[in-house]
């Protein structure tokens, strides 16, 4: 594994927060009144999705076969890992490198999650890290918890986000043929992996009702995975530990680690953005790390970046709290 050099992180514009620009944007935003334009098409789609998901939840609890319950759990785990291990840790942060076969695998399971194609997802996430909690942050917590959770998808993007996002260098993403294939074929891929196969397999393999399979394994599971991911943008900037940086809004949170297969170490992640582990939590709370380590064990993942212990300790002593870190690791480590 490769240990991260701090100056190497700072030199890459999509990894480190630009504190000077953040302060400037925050001061400018105080002088402005934000008028959010609602995108009613998105509102209607999400309302319909949540109604369908509630039907699916009822069926999952009272009507679905046990095999379908397990199938829903498996799909959530795979789809989430396509986001966390793929769009997030591999492509947005370049926290490790992978062979073509592994990248194709991650791209396909990412399509289960249906959270925009990986290029768009990584672009938004790089904006989030570079200009955290400003108008150039897609889901800034300064605009409220609901906005950070899902409201940002229900309104038009702020002009500042469009301007700043256009400045990012995304050439590494556009040069990856796997990502370009997904981008060009996104709707068919989502149709197959997010909706068709999740419905078809329970019907064929264990005789589940097509109606129940669709509402549980497709709609409910899709909606649940969305909220698990969104909780990182909202809950993980709201309540939890801040052992690494008390100045940041990000926190480490146990429950978001469980729901989002290992993404809950958010204070750690914002402090050390290129560490492939994204937290110091134990493996049972970081299934994405387990997946990446498995990929390394079979030769498909390499150059996993980690943060040296002395750098973590120095950071905690200067900007965080060593005692809080010890307490957190005692509970979660």
From Swiss-Prot:
Top-level EC class: oxidoreductase
Subcellular location: Membrane
EC number: 1.14.19.-
Entry GO MF terms: iron ion binding; stearoyl-CoA 9-desaturase activity
Comment field on protein domains: The histidine box domains may contain the active site and/or be involved in metal ion binding.
Misc: Cytochrome b5 CYTB-5.2 is specifically required for the desaturase activity, its knockdown or mutation alters the enzyme activity.
Protein name listed in UniProt: Delta(9)-fatty-acid desaturase fat-5
